[in-house]
Amino acid sequence: MWNYTDKVKEHFFNPKNAGALDEADDVGEVGSITCGDALKLMMKVNPDQPGHRDANFQTFGCGSAIASLRSALTEMIIGKTVDEALGQVTNRDIAEYLGGLPPEKMDCSVMGAEALPAAIANFKGEGLVDDHEEGELVCKCFGIDAAMIERAVTVNSLTTLEEVTHYTKAGGSCQTCHEKIEEVLEAVLAKTGAVGPAQAPSPTPPARSGWTPSSRWPRRPRHAPAKLTNVQRMQKIMFAIEDWRPQIQRDGGDVELVDIDGKDIYVRLTGACSGCSQSAGTMMGVQAKLVEALGEFVRVKPASLLPVGA
């Protein structure tokens, strides 16, 4: 389990500025629900003074993304001018504001930082420069392109494949894009004159309790894992859900597997989780567990969305 600071927990249990913002002046949207993580950032600009007077968010993702990072981002930009927000709020600023994050969750802060320029471009009536060109999609599982990887590497001084995965999610599922990620990483390091992992130790992420360099991921093989049979795949799904159930049961809820349809896994939340405001976060927790267990991207959906007659 990851160790979170008290400030992260505070934003998780008492998120600020969640929900739609009527008559927002600037709106930025990044990510995709299909890929498991999406964020809509909405802001109002003070007509009398050059600063943001309000900011709200709507998001779909894991618990730290839903409540902590997005909530913290809105708190950080309220009161700042458009230019101040654009120039002073990076993903590292978000992580430091929260007192540090586990390396594995830095991707949530990166998405927050990606939404900000999108919202400001919308406010200025400008089209956000789209540096995604055809053929540049690197990680199909999470929809991560080369441009996003390049920005994450440059801003955060990343030097290894594992760090890129922590900060962007790229390569965190089927692993077939690892070689392409390393090509992008090496190109950025060569362009900036930075040293790679063979010449220097990796940078230390924002500090957090219980983290040491030895806790980083071991390098995974580049080849794709062996294909599972249908029975093996079903068993892994069942075992992963059973492994997740105790965490949900501690809060008075439960989850049960209903059906499997290719990449779509249908589950039913019961008890306290049924109709809970955090049910989307619970579903994403189950999804993350299944992606990790299967080594492929899958979508976890509520049983109510199961096609009629299935």
UniProtKB/Swiss-Prot annotation:
GO terms for biological process: iron-sulfur cluster assembly; nitrogen fixation. Its cofactor is [2Fe-2S] cluster. Binds 1 [2Fe-2S] cluster per subunit. It holds the Pfam family NifU. Transmembrane segments: none annotated. The keyword Electron transport does not apply. Belongs to the NifU family. May be involved in the formation or repair of [Fe-S] clusters present in iron-sulfur proteins. This is Nitrogen fixation protein NifU. The lineage of its organism: Bacteria, Pseudomonadati, Pseudomonadota, Alphaproteobacteria, Rhodospirillales.
